[in-house]
């Protein structure tokens, strides 16, 4: 596939709050498990095997652009990708997810953590980005990273958790060690993400998947300062910055305070409600991914409701409120993308009130 001459800037315009001829759309986890081509690859390769091979990884990344017509691609990688670079051994186990055999338990464990050198430690990430941007994509490529709290939760729990008790106990009982861990992870994230931008990523999304486990007061005490440092550094790169977390609607106002461009919402907080609470930056979201398993009439109606709310401002990007489920039909995503484009374009032209 050769890169087309016409570059689709719709996503970038919306991220900056500028006018575009239609509402841009992309989907979290659009590349991967819901696609037959990907499942066929997974019969032969593990996740890390795919992500370590730029040609394969680029293929998976660009599939949704070619098949669904989305307005942005997101790099196919795992949030755990950079952790081995600082001395954290990670294994992806089927049916479980990321597993860390030697969880963080002390200040000494944190002091042992090293620094990332992207060119040496994750060259395959940078090569994939360059391959996509220089040869294969006519839409912006979104790079990404996990956020400190979510990465720390895996490092302390040793894997996925339902309540994050060990993580929060560590945070409360060893604040100095916690602050050092946040600082080291922030250093890693800043260097890792800047390398993605230098390689050609046109926007960045920071995923804080599990930060909703914290109340607002604890977020402001233990997390918000380090997030401010991360976004302040990344803002110097002049690409749109997006923040997203699941079950964290109570933190949307705090995200809005950070030097970022786009506030990602899950399905629990309506766009109208978010804006009534003072969210004036671009909003991204927020169709409940479960709705994609419903009849098309339901999908269409719920999508209209979100578009009608979101399009009250030029700063709106249509997405799901979480990742695409494995059992969602690719045909549904293709149809949904076309509907968002057509409905929003007609609405912008005044055909819908």
Curated annotation (Swiss-Prot):
Keywords, alphabetical: Cytoplasm, Decarboxylase, Lyase, Porphyrin biosynthesis
Superkingdom to which the source organism belongs: Bacteria
Disulfide feature: none
Pathway per the UniProt entry: Porphyrin-containing compound metabolism; protoporphyrin-IX biosynthesis; coproporphyrinogen-III from 5-aminolevulinate: step 4/4
Subcellular location per the Swiss-Prot or TrEMBL entry: Cytoplasm
EC assignment: 4.1.1.37
Binding residue positions for substrate: 29-33, 48, 78, 154, 209, 322
GO cellular component labels: cytosol
Catalysis performed (reactions): uroporphyrinogen III + 4 H(+) = coproporphyrinogen III + 4 CO2
Record-linked PROSITE patterns: UROD_1, UROD_2
GO molecular function, one term: uroporphyrinogen decarboxylase activity
A single BP term in Gene Ontology: protoporphyrinogen IX biosynthetic process
Class of the enzyme per the UniProt entry, highest EC level: lyase
InterPro entries, per the entry: UROD/MetE-like_sf, Uroporphyrinogen_deCO2ase_HemE, Uroporphyrinogen_deCOase
Main location: cytoplasm
Record-annotated site: Transition state stabilizer: 78
Subunit structure as annotated in this protein's UniProt entry: Homodimer.
Role, per record: Catalyzes the decarboxylation of four acetate groups of uroporphyrinogen-III to yield coproporphyrinogen-III.
Family per similarity comment: Belongs to the uroporphyrinogen decarboxylase family.
PANTHER family: METHYLTETRAHYDROFOLATE:HOMOCYSTEINE METHYLTRANSFERASE RELATED, UROPORPHYRINOGEN DECARBOXYLASE
Protein's name in the database: Uroporphyrinogen decarboxylase
Organism: Bacillus subtilis (strain 168)
